[in-house]
A protein has these predicted regions:
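Acidic/polar low-complexity segments and flexible, solvent-exposed patches
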Residues: 1-18, 24-335
């Protein structure tokens, strides 16, 4: 029998070892598969746990954020309400502007209705102390001025505006109310004034103020007398050759009832008499021959009632009928 070749021996040797190797491999496969399955399950469980945890935290964060947002909104709303409340109770520091709406006469007092505005004041109160409130005419001359105090009785604003009535007593205004052209006036509001005495009494709803300095009142009265002479000139001319009555004659520096007359005294008497006799007109005596015909000096003011009579006798009777004394009223006929 021929000897086996080396190839055949190798094949026989390999054939004898394959069953052991295969058996080993077959035993390992289930173990490997089981390990893989276990790892996969563990991985799935881990992923699930992570996912669950993430979603839970996200939900908590969302809830927390939502709660925080709502809380912030509530805090902001409360803060806004507190600020609004503070604005309502806080006093305004802005000095308001003023405009004259109307004037009227109440006895010898002039009542001015004034519109004040200060946008910054909103709905707050203004407590200005010692405030000069002046009215000026179209040529910027002061025709009324007094010192008012809003510290104890504040000016209450609504949406930045307020309307008040102010009382100007004689000595605080220098033009008759019916001769003031409201639309051509301007007003000045100034704090830090020095009141000249106590405030005059209020008249109804119109609050009274204190006088301004005597020197200022004297200057305004002198200017007012000059304005009145010019204003009344044509009305005086209308009385030429017509009997009328003279209610006073006044000269600066003259003594009347123990008092030296100053311009503000003369103008005060003019306003007092005109309040009762609205036709009254002021004249400068030196401008009319009736007062200069005998060569006398006539450098003084005269106030005519403006009433017209049929005779000088009727004019004299009018004086006595209206309670004037012999030295307070006289019949005149200007020419």
């Amino acid at each position: 029998m021929p000897a086996p070749s080396s190839l055949q021996l190798d094949m026989q040797s390999g054939t004898q070892s394959d069953p052991q190797a295969n058996d080993c491999k077959n035993r390992k496969k289930p173990i490997i598969i089981a390990i893989i399955v276990i790892i996969a399950v563990i991985a799935l469980i881990a992923r699930f746990v992570v996912w669950k945890s993430t979603n839970h935290n996200s939900g908590d964060d969302s809830a927390q954020n939502g709660s925080s947002t709502a809380q912030n909104a509530d805090e902001q709303s409360n803060k806004t309400k507190q600020n609004d409340a503070a604005k309502q109770t806080k006093d305004c520091a802005t000095t308001p502007d003023a405009g004259l709406e109307s004037v009227e006469k109440n006895g010898t007092t002039m009542i001015a209705t004034v519109a004040f505005s200060a946008h910054a004041c909103g709905d707050t109160a203004w407590k200005g102390e010692d405030v000069t409130i002046s009215i000026k005419d179209s040529i910027n001359e002061v025709i009324a001025s007094a010192v008012y105090d809003f510290a104890s009785d504040p000016m209450q604003f609504t949406s930045g505006t307020a309307t008040l009535e102010l009382a100007y007593a004689i000595g605080q205004y220098w033009r008759a109310s019916d001769q003031i052209e409201t639309k051509s006036t301007s007003m000045v509001v100034q704090k830090g004034a020095t009141p000249n005495g106590n405030a005059v009494a209020s008249v109804g709803d119109a609050r009274g103020g204190a006088n301004i300095a005597d020197s200022d009142a004297e200057r305004y009265a002198q200017l007012a007398l000059s304005w009145q002479l010019s204003h009344d000139r044509s009305a005086v001319s209308g009385l030429y050759d017509i009997p009328t009555t003279q209610l006073f004659s006044r000269k600066y520096g003259m003594e009347v009832d123990g008092k030296t007359q100053q311009y503000r005294d003369i103008y005060a008497q003019y306003l007092t008499l005109r309040a009762s006799w609205p036709k009254a007109v002021l004249a400068w005596a030196a401008d009319y021959s009736y007062y200069t015909r005998y060569g006398h000096e006539a450098d003084y003011y005269v106030l005519l009632s403006g009433e017209e009579f049929g005779s000088v006798a009727d004019a004299r009777a009018w004086c006595s009928d209206n309670g004037f004394g012999e030295n307070d009223c006289m019949a005149v006929q200007i020419n």
